[in-house]
Curated annotation (Swiss-Prot):
Protein name (record): Large ribosomal subunit protein bL21
Keyword Ribosomal protein: yes
Top-level taxonomic group: Bacteria
Oligomeric and partner information: Part of the 50S ribosomal subunit. Contacts protein L20.
GO cellular component, one term: ribosome
Annotated segments matching region Disordered: 114-135
PANTHER family hit by this protein: 50S RIBOSOMAL PROTEIN L21, LARGE RIBOSOMAL SUBUNIT PROTEIN BL21M
Gene that encodes the chain: rplU
Function text: This protein binds to 23S rRNA in the presence of protein L20.
Amino acid sequence: MTYAIIETGGKQIRVEPGRFYDIELLPTEPDEKVTIDSVLLVQHDGAVSIGQPLVTGATVEGTVMRHYRGRKVLVYKMKPKKKTRKKRGHRQEITRLMIDSITLNGEVFVAQGEAEKETPVLDETPAEEVETAAE
């Protein structure tokens, strides 16, 4: 299993190829490729590369799926024994990012399903021949 820890939006996130993650808003359009260079750790088949603070030669590539707004967060402030109350709320802007690959020193790690995918071989025998063979 391959994973990396990246830093984006002031947060550290553990990411794996082939999965999507909700992160802080990125200034890109949907279906656009994004390369994240701030990689703190890469793990592949038991070999761990830890950066000080960043891993040199490591990048994480992904595709922006969509932008949306998160759930409303209510902030309520109150001072006891006083008549001071404030109720405010906000919605965070979020980007959904699909992680395509993790690269370490030129070696590219992709999701296991993507590496094994091949074009399916279609049987090109006409349907009439199949029916006559069945009789």
